Amino acid sequence: MDIRAAEISAILKDQIKNYGAEAKVSDVGSVLSVGDGIARVYGLDEVKAGELVEFPGGIKGMALNLERDNVGCVIFGDDRGIKEGDTVKRLGSIVDTSVGKGLLGRVVDGLGEPIDGKGPLKGVAERRRVDVKAPGIIPRKSVHEPMATGIKAIDAMIPVGRGQRELIIGDRQTGKTAIALDTILNQKAINEGDDESAKLYCIYVAVGQKRSTVAQIVKTLEENGALDYTIIVAATASDPAPMQFLAPFTACAMAEYFRDNGMHALIVYDDLSKQAVAYRQMSLLLRRPPGREAYPGDVFYLHSRLLERAAKLNEANGSGSMTALPIIETQANDVSAYIPTNVISITDGQIFLETDLFYQGIRPAVNVGLSVSRVGSAAQTKAMKQVAGKMKGELAQYREMAAFAQFGSDLDAATQKLLNRGQRLTELLKQPQFSPLSMEEQVCVIYAGTRGYLDKLPTSDVQRYEADLLRHLHGEHAALLASIRTEKKLTDDSESQLKAALAKFTEHFA
């Protein structure tokens, strides 16, 4: 065997010359203490606020408190497998989530991972950061398109527009979630149509709710054919506080994908009181100084930075919109508590639900006097404005008179007429759950109420009258309903047709 020394030395020299020391360097630290979903970590010198870190077993966390000698991290998962001395690795990225139409019809957790057992996500467009800045002033446009809820009391007197933030506030068990679900179900007709620019994709965020409640909501949406255009983000009561804090931001990033691509999204935060409680828990465990009601000082910023991301964009930015319906739970109708006042001041109006009304059988239990929509009237269809314009005033007068009428028995004819009309309008605004009405149906029904067609009926017959009237209109006057739907206003011709139809129907109603 011939060994050529020169050749071997040439090969070795070449190997040495081209040798690259490719050592993988990762910034690591070690756990000092862990408990209650919070880990104190020593040694992550270069970590940034809000950056993701990884604990043993693939459990992720987020660095929130950067102190001189340690870093306070919140853990997105079970902290029982983490112990003192464990190695923690920087991931060099901020929390992000999958977005796109592939998420429609799915149930995901607070990090955007599927939890519905239907396999991995398909058709995902991209990944987006969950906490981004809201659009500035220039890309926005004032709200001008209606976002129909299908609920008479809301669409007539507290109208919501696309791009608005309308708070739903009330005690527990007053029907807050029911209003949000009705709104999602009401989009079915639009979403089954061919007009892509009118479609409204819905995202429902369940924060700190029972798993059985979330399962019931999924079932309701599925049975009514609404799950196909809805994404459900669930951080339930058994999930760690960091997941409950993060879920609304994750869902918001999903809605922003639709908004930024010229589409329309509706997002329901159910509810932000529980998100604030989760954030308070995290802040106190991280030893941040407490403020009013033990919430941290930046709890206002927590909600404002989330809700400011709902917007209507102008034509140059694709004309997309994102409408937010945040829900807040009050204690004993106390609207002046810390979180309720914060969110009322951030949003563009509120729908106030009352326990007393609910128990009187007025459902949805909307207190029309305290509820307001600050920008929605610009988005209301002309037809609805024409028929419901005076309704809020009439009901306010009725409530005032009803309070006085309790004391006196002899009332003049005008007062008696006002009380009669008010009782019938209140009865007319009642609506069963999961039965939203289209705009043209609402217009006809409210026209009958405000123009005095119900004044001679017994109050107990009002709801039967409404059901029979709608059946009659669909059967005999389908063209009239179609004309109101396409024109979006009551023309002289359609108004005279409606008057004739109502007069004839009321005469024969028994």
UniProtKB/Swiss-Prot annotation:
Protein family membership: Belongs to the ATPase alpha/beta chains family.
Protein name according to UniProt: ATP synthase subunit alpha
NCBIfam families, sorted: atpA, PRK13343.1
Main location: membrane
Keywords from the named record: ATP synthesis, ATP-binding, Cell inner membrane, Cell membrane, CF(1), Hydrogen ion transport, Ion transport, Membrane, Nucleotide-binding, Translocase, Transport
Catalytic activity field: ATP + H2O + 4 H(+)(in) = ADP + phosphate + 5 H(+)(out)
Site (Required for activity): S371
Bilayer topology: Peripheral membrane protein
Organism, scientific name: Maricaulis maris (strain MCS10) (Caulobacter maris)
Gene expressing this chain: atpA
Binding-site residues, ATP: G170, D171, R172, Q173, T174, G175, K176, T177
Function description: Produces ATP from ADP in the presence of a proton gradient across the membrane. The alpha chain is a regulatory subunit.
PROSITE patterns: ATPASE_ALPHA_BETA
